């Protein structure tokens, strides 16, 4: 899994049957934008957990999804180690 930030929504008036009714969000990750199927109801500005490839397709089985939002990240602190 990877972490990204929701940047906006993607609207597709025509899409394959497996994606009908499936929200699609634009997610910024490592300076790039990707489109991901939203499985958790994430909103713009939220940090999210993303699954990719076959792991994403397990959650969206009838769609050709390469990326899926599978969680919303609570505020977190990065643990820092000090070399002695």
Pin down the residues of each PLM region.
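C-terminal structural segments of small proteins and small subunits
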Residues: 51, 55-84
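Generic structural signal for buried aliphatic residues
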Residues: 11, 48-49
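Short beta-strand-to-turn element immediately C-terminal to the catalytic PLP-Schiff-base lysine
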Residues: 27-29, 51
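N-terminal first-folded block
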Residues: 1-27
């Amino acid at each position: 899994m990877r972490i990204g930030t929701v940047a906006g929504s993607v609207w597709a008036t025509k899409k394959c049957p497996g994606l009908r009714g499936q929200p699609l969000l634009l997610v910024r990750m490592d300076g790039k934008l990707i489109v991901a199927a939203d499985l958790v109801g994430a909103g713009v500005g939220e940090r999210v957990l993303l699954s990719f490839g076959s792991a994403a397709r397990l959650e969206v089985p009838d769609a050709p999804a390469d990326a899926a939002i599978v969680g919303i990240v609570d505020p977190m602190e990065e643990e820092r180690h000090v070399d002695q």
